[in-house]
Structure formats: structure tokens, C-alpha cells
């Protein structure tokens, strides 16, 4: 007797706001369906505007970039992830896509230069409430 498997596609998104889901779906052609959480529109920033984006924001914050671009974000008030992997609750955490996998932050700014589609998906979807994309 032949086994006929049933394929289920899990595309309901319970993590990100409608705005983040719409952005990711549009940019990466990902089949994601929001559950109705409303938030801010996705922002586009220059590197100089990153500090202002995070100012006054509550919750965990992160800048996510490819490993080779992390030094661009070594500034006052930003905390580059150390080997111990400790996340700062007060500063802006700076980390690679790989380091961000499985984590969630209230606000995320992504410097997506050189990222693959998969890396962009991981980076963008770390943001629970607010996402910004850093472009030059």
C-alpha cells in the first residue's frame, strides 16, 4: 500500500506586526500571513539616523548586519555581542544574522548589505514591533 503524505504549509505569522509581515512578503516574496498585530511602518534609515531610531524605545533593541559590517555600529550606547552571548537590556545590541537567529527584539535596524534572501528573512523577522532598514 502506498503512503500518500499530506503537506501542510505553516504561513501564519504570530511574531511580527502586519507592517513587518507586509514588508517581508513584498521584498522577499515570502508567503506570510499576519494575525492582526498593528505597529509602525517599516522605516528606511541612513547609518547616521540609527541612534535616533532607537532613542526612547522600550524593550530589547538590535542592529543586525553581516559579520564584516558590524564594526560600522561600534558606537556609544551600542553593545557588540561578545563571545558569552549576553544580550544587553538597556543598550542597542549589535550582532550578525547568525547570532540573531532564534532571538526576538522590540525594535530592530537591519543593515542588509551583502545578505542573502534567507539572511534578510531571518534579520527582518527578529523585530516584534518596529523594523528599520539601513541603506546608504
Residue ranges, per PLM feature:
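Conserved helicase motor core of SF1/SF2 NTP-dependent helicases
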Residues: 1-136
Amino acid at each position: 500500500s502506498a503512503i500518500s503524505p499530506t503537506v501542510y504549509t505553516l504561513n501564519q505569522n504570530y511574531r511580527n506586526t502586519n507592517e513587518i509581515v507586509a514588508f517581508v512578503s513584498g521584498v522577499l516574496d515570502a508567503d506570510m500571513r499576519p494575525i492582526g498585530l498593528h505597529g509602525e511602518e517599516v522605516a528606511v534609515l541612513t547609518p547616521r539616523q540609527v541612534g535616533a531610531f532607537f532613542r526612547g524605545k522600550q524593550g530589547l533593541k538590535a542592529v543586525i548586519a553581516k559579520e564584516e559590517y558590524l564594526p560600522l555600529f561600534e558606537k556609544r550606547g551600542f553593545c557588540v555581542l561578545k563571545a558569552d552571548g549576553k544580550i544587553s537590556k538597556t543598550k542597542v545590541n549589535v550582532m550578525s544574522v547568525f547570532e540573531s537567529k532564534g532571538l526576538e527584539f522590540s525594535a530592530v535596524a537591519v543593515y542588509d548589505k551583502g545578505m542573502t534572501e534567507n539572511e534578510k528573512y531571518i534579520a527582518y523577522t527578529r523585530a516584534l514591533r518596529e523594523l528599520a532598514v539601513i541603506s546608504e
